[in-house]
Amino acid sequence: MHCPFCAAVDTKVIDSRLVGDGSQVRRRRQCLECHERFTTFEMAELVMPRVIKSDDIREPFDEEKLRRGMQKALEKRPVSSDDVEMAISYIKSQLRATGEREVPSKMIGNLVMDELKKLDKVAYIRFASVYRSFEDIREFGEEIARLQG
């Protein structure tokens, strides 16, 4: 790593420590030229797969879009924001775990439905009604019956 003080190429690591939950490493470095010390933080860059929409258009994964969709389904429901964030993290880890560069949007929708089903049944029905384009009350009833059965 280049020294931020003199731009020298050679620096050495003096100390390394895990930060927080262990997903980040704090390194204390010293420049071999000017001998100044500085701190860096290192973490793995995890690339999310691209999303293949139903019309075959590809777009980058949008975590905010995922969050908005879940929050809309969970509106005025007794679910903590921590639980929502944990569900989002789980969905993202499942998508990365596929090892694929691209995933169909349908897979994301199914993962969201699975997580909402665990968090809140009403939110699950709300999301499913839009995601599966329920046409009438009968389809709502069938989905509710599946939940209860």
Swiss-Prot record:
GO terms for biological process: negative regulation of DNA-templated transcription. Its cofactor is Zn(2+). Binds 1 zinc ion. One of its GO terms (molecular function) is DNA binding. InterPro entries: ATP-cone_dom, NrdR-like_N, RNR_NrdR-like. Keywords: ATP-binding, DNA-binding, Metal-binding, Nucleotide-binding, Repressor, Transcription, Transcription regulation, Zinc, Zinc-finger. It comes from the Bacteria. It holds the Pfam family ATP-cone. Residues 49-139 form the ATP-cone domain. A zinc finger (unnamed) spans 3-34. Belongs to the NrdR family. HAMAP family: NrdR. Negatively regulates transcription of bacterial ribonucleotide reductase nrd genes and operons by binding to NrdR-boxes. This is Transcriptional repressor NrdR. It comes from Photorhabdus laumondii subsp. laumondii (strain DSM 15139 / CIP 105565 / TT01).
